[in-house]
C-alpha cells in the first residue's frame, strides 16, 4: 500500500503513523474495496477469538479477503485446548498448551495474527496487563493485530 510504514504490531490507534492519512485511505478503500486485493496474495491472516464476536469477526474476515488474504479463524472457547500463560507451569489437566508453543505454531501458519480477548473483570491489575495479547506479542514471530481494546 502506498507510503505506509510497515509496523510490527497494530495494538492501538496510536500505532498509526498518520491518522488523517489512514482515514483518507480508508475512505478510498471504501469507495473501491478491491483496489488492494493483490496486497495479501499468498498471505494468511489468522484470527484467534478467545471470546464470542459478531461484527469484529465478520468485518476482519471481510477485510482480509478484500486484501486478497486467506483467512483462518479459531475460537478458543470451543475449538482448542485451554492455553496456559504463566511461565514454569506444569502442563496438566485442562491446560495442555502453553502460549509460548501456541504462538510459535500460529506463527508458522500465519503471516499476521488478530487476537480478540476480553478482560476477565475479576482482577483489574491482570486485566490491564492484557495477558493474552501481551504473551502472543512476546512469543509470536509475526505481527499481531489487537481486535479488542
Predicted features along the sequence, with ranges:
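Short charge-dense sequence patches
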Residues: 5-17, 83-85, 104, 108-118
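Anion-binding alpha/beta catalytic cores of soluble intermediary-metabolism enzymes, centered on
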Residues: 95-107, 111-149
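Active-site cofactor/substrate anionic-group-binding motifs, chiefly glycine-
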Residues: 44, 49-108
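Positively charged, low-complexity intrinsically disordered leader regions
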Residues: 2-58, 62
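Catalytic cores of large soluble enzymes that bind and process phosphate-bearing ligands
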Residues: 11-18, 52, 91-94, 98, ...
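Solvent-exposed, non-transmembrane amphipathic alpha-helical segments
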Residues: 39, 65, 84, 123-126
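Structural signal for conserved beta-strand scaffold positions within catalytic alpha/beta enzyme cores
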Residues: 12, 47, 73, 144-146
Amino acid at each position: 500500500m502506498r507510503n505506509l510504514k510497515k509496523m510490527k504490531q497494530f495494538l492501538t490507534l496510536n500505532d498509526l503513523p498518520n491518522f488523517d492519512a489512514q482515514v483518507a485511505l480508508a475512505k478510498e478503500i471504501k469507495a473501491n474495496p478491491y483496489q488492494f486485493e493483490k496486497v495479501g496474495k499468498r498471505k494468511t491472516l489468522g484470527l484467534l477469538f478467545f471470546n464470542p464476536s459478531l461484527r469484529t469477526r465478520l468485518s476482519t474476515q471481510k477485510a482480509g479477503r478484500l486484501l486478497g488474504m486467506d483467512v483462518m479463524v479459531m475460537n478458543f472457547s470451543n475449538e482448542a485446548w485451554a492455553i496456559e500463560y504463566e511461565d514454569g507451569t506444569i502442563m496438566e489437566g485442562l491446560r495442555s498448551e502453553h502460549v509460548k508453543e501456541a504462538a510459535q505454531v500460529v506463527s508458522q501458519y500465519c503471516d499476521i495474527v488478530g487476537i480478540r480477548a476480553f478482560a476477565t473483570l475479576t482482577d483489574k491489575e491482570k486485566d490491564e496487563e492484557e495477558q493474552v495479547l501481551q504473551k502472543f506479542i512476546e512469543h509470536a514471530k509475526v505481527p499481531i493485530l489487537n481486535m479488542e481494546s
